[in-house]
Design a protein with these regions (language model features):
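Short, basic, alpha-helical segments at the C-terminal edge of helix-turn-helix-like DNA-binding modules
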Residues: 28-29, 58-69
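HTH DNA-binding helix-turn interface
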Residues: 20-24, 37-54
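C-terminal peripheral helix-coil segments that are non-catalytic and often amphipathic
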Residues: 147-186
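Hydrophobic alpha-helical connector segments
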Residues: 66-91, 98
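Amphipathic alpha-helical packing segments from all-alpha helical-bundle domains
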Residues: 97-140, 163-166, 170
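Append "Primarily bacterial transcriptional regulators
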Residues: 11, 30-35, 43, 82
Length: 186
């Protein structure tokens, strides 16, 4: 394993440990470095800020699921992934604004959702709107689920999200087709 990967993993492990006991907003780069015995220069050589480190953790751990050709059907695995490390992600998803994990995750799932949605609409703008709508809903549902005092099992959450996405997509398509049909008759 290259030295840079060892360093990144040590920093990631340190951040994850710290996030078990305090919110990300209260953790400094100095705290992360002190926890794993590295200096700030090493941190900034690899990451722009602590939010960049959070995103790297997600990319590294989540890439196996995301990069599989059947990733669309593996939403249950995605839920299991978040559930297994829920303290970390519960904390990471609380941050909003620039460089937030919430926005980063939303951007990462949009291509998956776009593939799922396909060409439901003639208009690319309508398709993009639906994808953004679904991504926002998925992120909100994930946050609510992880913040619950006793989150339901990942397989149940995955089932709920899938069913909801299908129902919303079907309702949108039906409404869209009805509107197009009415517009054509006028």
């Amino acid at each position: 394993m290259p030295d840079s990967l060892i360093t990144k993993r040590a920093l990631a492990s340190s951040l994850k440990e710290l996030m078990k006991t305090q919110p990300l907003t209260k953790i400094s780069v100095g705290d992360i470095c002190e926890k794993c015995g590295m200096n700030r220069k090493s941190f900034y050589y690899h990451f722009c800020d602590k939010y960049d480190l959070v995103n790297w953790i997600f990319d590294t751990e989540f890439s196996e699921i995301r990069n599989r050709p059947d990733h669309i059907t593996k939403f249950e695995e995605i839920c299991e992934y978040f559930y297994a490390d829920r303290e970390f992600y519960r904390n990471a998803l609380q941050i909003t604004g620039q460089n937030s994990f919430r926005d980063y995750f939303r951007m990462q799932i949009q291509p998956i959702l776009k593939e799922l949605v396909g060409n439901l609409f003639d208009s690319e703008e309508d398709t993009e709107f639906l994808v953004t709508f679904l991504a926002d809903g998925m992120v909100s549902a994930l946050i609510r689920w992880l913040n619950g005092s006793d989150p339901e099992p990942p397989e149940e959450m995955a089932r709920r999200v899938r069913r909801t996405m299908v129902a919303i997509s079907q309702a949108i398509v039906t409404t869209y087709e009805e509107e197009e049909s009415k517009a054509g008759k006028e």
